[in-house]
Amino acid sequence: MTEQYQHRARKRFGQNFLHDAGVIDKILRAIRAKPEDRLLEIGPGQGALTEGLLNSGAQLDVVELDKDLIPILTGQFGNKPNFNLHQGDALKFDFNSLGAEPRSLRVVGNLPYNISTPLIFHLLQNASLIRDMHFMLQKEVVERMAAGPGGGDWGRLSIMVQYHCRVEHLFNVGPGAFNPPPKVDSAIVRLVPYETLPHPAKDHRVLERVVREAFNQRRKTLRNTLKLLLSSDEITASGVDGSLRPEQLDLAAFVRLADTLSEKVVTE
């Protein structure tokens, strides 16, 4: 990067700029962007991935919060006909404003670790617009996303992401690939929203509520954590053992509990 475009990473934005050419190339090869694609990059930073994405010929919208990076990105890529820059907070961004067709958006990002989980949940609310997502995240977060029942990593994030998406932990990235180096390892994850949900809930908001309540006290039994929502008999009627802890249940079991609660709310 030339001196004209130098920018110091800001801690309050959780900025760690990717600079390792080998890692950048590996990410771009995992994405395999094509000219007919509609790409959305969240947090382009200094444009480490942006140039390669633009070179694919695909239409690229980028969302960047840091106002100081806007002239840098405009200076580097503003003359590209397939580049469209949005200054703002991705957590508040209206993805419908892009006018994308259903299941057409390919979302990419080296996400700031301090907002990665809420941003993932925001994106899941727009899953019907998204074809796939490729993110650089804290390795621990990716492990939680990809986790299965029975372990300590299985929780609210695992369940809600896997409700909407197929999860692939692609590869890990060490701190040295960034400037400044983060204090944790990173990983690349691919999320592919399902065309047809394998375990559809009657109301996904009720599922979110049940999962949140269950894992608020994850060491307690379901009979205790869900007592304000469901009785012991209602848990049993859902085909679930109320003496189990939440981490012992799979996604399908949580959907059954949520559907029981949905029916209860309707009848009441």
UniProtKB/Swiss-Prot annotation:
Q: Name one GO molecular function term.
A: RNA binding
Instruction: Fetch the Gene3D superfamilies from UniProt.
Output: Ribosomal RNA adenine dimethylase-like, domain 2 (1.10.8.100), Vaccinia Virus protein VP39 (3.40.50.150)
- PROSITE patterns the record matches: RRNA_A_DIMETH, SAM_RNA_A_N6_MT
Q: Which domain of life is it from?
A: Bacteria
Major localization class: cytoplasm
Example of a GO cellular component annotation carried by this entry: cytosol
Question: Which EC number(s) does UniProt give?
Answer: 2.1.1.182
The record's keywords, sorted A to Z, are:
Cytoplasm, Methyltransferase, RNA-binding, rRNA processing, S-adenosyl-L-methionine, Transferase
Q: Name one Pfam family in it.
A: RrnaAD
- Protein's recorded name: Ribosomal RNA small subunit methyltransferase A
Supply the source organism for this entry.
Pseudomonas savastanoi pv. phaseolicola (strain 1448A / Race 6) (Pseudomonas syringae pv. phaseolicola (strain 1448A / Race 6))
Gene name of this polypeptide: rsmA
